[in-house]
């Protein structure tokens, strides 16, 4: 019987017991006798009922033990795939409740409503602007083609090795698109397929041809707030698009071949290898600390672009690619590709009629994030002349995808930068989301009332707290974050895990789940922050609470011993390991902002951790040596604490 059904613990022995047992017969006899409250009939009925219930309890306990043992064995033999397969199939109950939509009661109507919504979203903000840019592009492209002959592409031939590299970059286990092909088809196919694909891709580049199926996608609406039990509005959904696997392979080939034409400013931290949110937060924290140390209040403007990826103008993008001298074959191929972009919406078992995407990058496309970064790169270039500077680096504007944060030493400078943003976004046919764009201050003058910061439309609110890349920045005399909301998310996730496990008592399994699924919530981006002892204590308490509940104790010394013998370190020591690993990567980072700021200011951060654990400087064998040093330090701490008691 499937684990998702109501009585997954039921087995054939219980069925036989139910048939052969006198439980039902004694119950019927008791009912026929008028349901007496005493006497031999009443005693017989209760005895049979108890026997039957005990058999059910035994079956339930056996099933829970079996699941727990399977999970434990998967951990012991280091089979993470099997572990999560067992967890999802036998522990996580699959919800049978359909997502309810406001004013819609059937899948056909829902699919049509989503189709209309997504087709409207993927249209230009200004149709006249789009027509004007289309004419401008057509004129520019005719001149561009006359300068760059098509035979210049003969040197850009795709080979089987490049196709293999592209296939290796794609994640496994993703859903198939219209063609029903998945990555597993390519990884298990005959090697000659790679040669055939290489010839196909080469011909596509030379002739600027794109197969029509490369432009097809299936959009699946996902609610932005999945935990809400209320009826959802259509506007509260975002689309996840499934693209053909062969188009993804081709896009990876394009990324590898034409990377030099797609480079962007180091102030853009998204869509780059070995660079992420932690790097952006690290640079932000150091810039603010640097200015506060020099008695200057930093003014921050957190700007959000409304539906940035869905409103990208194709013709502006192609003209930007031409300015970068992208081969004309590639530009024309992208033009044809985007003109063939059609999506269908799938809701339940219903598939909508296709609709054309008139604006926005292709959802689910491998090239899409990089093309968007190219699209907004000129904005960062213009802002480089304004705002904060540090060691000769322009750090006045930092960007992660479509999230912009401006840093200025004065309100006047911040106002000037915001107006520049508005002007540049108008040239891109993009608009600010004024409801999500805010400003705040950090430094000694953070409490002073300030004049309004205005955009081309309205004023931006001054706030005391805002969310940036998953961390909650707080206005104050120094750089600080609010961890209370992080702790709330952590408690919610940990309670969900413990509720799923129920009475299954296996600390190894529970700790593995908490460490892999819940602890990342609590420790998100900590390596980029310089945590005080107070902040570490605040974060340590919820992590210790999990051990208190699991091992049924409130003694901190016992909790430390449990952490030692289970191999799960406290937050402060895990923070040290993550921070030192992060610093060792910053030294060789390809991002000039991260690398130069670390070389100029990272010495104190490293010295603090090195002194605490008597470490040497970070080097290549960090993982094997530094982790052992931190664990030994924790072991010595626990040993001393035990001896003192």
Give the role of each language-model region.
Residues 1-4, 10, 55, 64-66, ...:
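Non-catalytic, peripheral interaction segments enriched in hydrophobic/basic residues
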Residues 1-108, 112, 116, 120-122:
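Arg/Lys-enriched, amphipathic patches
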Residues 80-235, 241, 245, 249, ...:
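Surface-exposed loop/turn segments and immediately adjacent short secondary-structure elements
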Residues 153, 349, 430-465:
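Short, conserved micro-motifs composed of acidic
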Residues 172-181, 219, 232-242, 279-322:
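Conserved catalytic palm subdomain of right-hand nucleotidyl-transferase polymerases, strongest
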Residues 254-269, 371-407:
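Active-site palm subdomain of RNA-directed nucleic acid polymerases
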Residues 307-324, 399-426, 443-444, 475-477:
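Catalytic palm subdomain of template-directed nucleic-acid polymerases
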Residues 555, 560-645:
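Acidic catalytic cores of enzymes that act on phosphate-bearing nucleotides/polynucleotides
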């Amino acid at each position: 019987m499937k684990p998702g059904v109501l009585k997954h613990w039921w087995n054939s022995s219980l069925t036989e017991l139910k048939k052969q047992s006198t439980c039902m017969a004694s119950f019927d006899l008791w009912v026929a006798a008028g349901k007496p409250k005493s006497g031999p009939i009443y005693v017989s009925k209760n005895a049979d009922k108890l026997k039957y219930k005990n058999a059910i309890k035994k079956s339930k306990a056996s099933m829970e033990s079996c699941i727990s043992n399977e999970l434990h064995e998967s951990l012991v033999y280091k089979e993470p795939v099997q572990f999560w397969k067992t967890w999802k199939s036998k522990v996580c109950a699959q919800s049978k409740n359909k997502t309810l939509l406001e004013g819609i009661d059937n899948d056909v109507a829902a699919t049509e409503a989503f189709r209309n919504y997504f087709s409207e979203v993927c249209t230009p903000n200004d149709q006249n602007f789009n027509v004007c840019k289309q004419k401008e592009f057509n004129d520019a492209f005719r001149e561009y083609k006359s300068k760059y002959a098509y035979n210049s592409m003969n040197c850009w031939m795709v080979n089987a090795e490049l196709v293999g590299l592209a296939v290796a970059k794609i994640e496994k286990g993703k859903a198939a698109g219209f063609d029903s092909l998945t990555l597993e088809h390519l990884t298990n196919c005959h090697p000659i397929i790679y040669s055939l694909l290489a010839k196909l891709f080469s011909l596509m580049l030379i002739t600027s041809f794109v197969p029509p199926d490369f432009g097809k996608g299936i959009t699946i609406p996902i609610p932005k707030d999945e935990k809400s039990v209320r009826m959802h509005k259509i506007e509260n959904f975002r689309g996840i698009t499934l693209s053909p696997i062969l188009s993804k392979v081709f896009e990876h080939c394009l990324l590898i071949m034409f990377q030099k034409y797609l480079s962007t400013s180091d102030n853009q931290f998204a869509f780059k290898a070995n660079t992420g949110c932690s790097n952006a937060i690290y640079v932000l924290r150091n810039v603010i600390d640097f200015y506060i140390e020099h008695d200057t209040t930093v003014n921050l403007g957190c700007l959000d672009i409304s539906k940035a990826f869905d409103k990208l103008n194709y013709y502006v993008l192609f003209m930007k690619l031409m300015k970068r001298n992208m081969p004309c074959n590639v530009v024309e191929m992208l033009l044809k590709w985007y003109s063939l972009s059609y999506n269908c919406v799938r809701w339940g078992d219903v598939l909508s009629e296709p609709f054309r995407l008139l604006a926005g990058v292709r959802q689910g496309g491998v090239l899409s994030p990089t093309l968007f970064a190219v699209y907004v790169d000129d904005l960062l270039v213009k802002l480089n002349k304004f705002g904060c500077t540090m060691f000769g680096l322009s750090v006045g504007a930092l960007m992660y995808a479509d999230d912009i944060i401006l840093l200025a030493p004065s309100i006047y400078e911040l106002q000037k930068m915001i107006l520049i943003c508005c002007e540049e976004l108008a040239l891109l046919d993009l608009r600010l989301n004024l409801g999500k764009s805010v400003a705040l201050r950090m430094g000694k003058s953070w409490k002073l009332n300030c004049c309004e910061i205005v955009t081309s439309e309205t004023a931006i609110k001054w706030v005391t707290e805002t969310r940036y890349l998953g961390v909650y920045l707080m206005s104050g005399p120094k750089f600080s974050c609010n961890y209370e909301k992080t702790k709330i998310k952590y408690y919610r996730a940990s309670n969900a895990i413990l509720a799923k496990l129920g009475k299954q008592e296996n600390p190894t399994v529970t700790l593995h789940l908490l460490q892999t699924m819940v602890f990342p919530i609590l420790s998100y981006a900590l390596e980029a922050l310089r945590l005080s002892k107070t902040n570490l204590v605040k974060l340590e308490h919820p992590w210790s609470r999990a051990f208190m509940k699991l091992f049924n104790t409130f003694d901190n010394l016992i909790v430390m011993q449990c952490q030692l013998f289970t191999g799960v370190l406290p937050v402060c020591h895990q923070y040290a390991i993550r921070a030192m690993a992060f610093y060792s990567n910053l030294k060789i980072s390809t991002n000039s902002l991260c690398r130069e700021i670390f070389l100029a200011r990272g010495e104190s951060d490293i010295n603090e951790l090195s002194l605490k654990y008597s470490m040497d400087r970070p080097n290549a064998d960090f993982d094997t040596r530094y982790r052992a040093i931190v664990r030994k330090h924790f072991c010595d701490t626990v040993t001393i604490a035990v001896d003192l008691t």
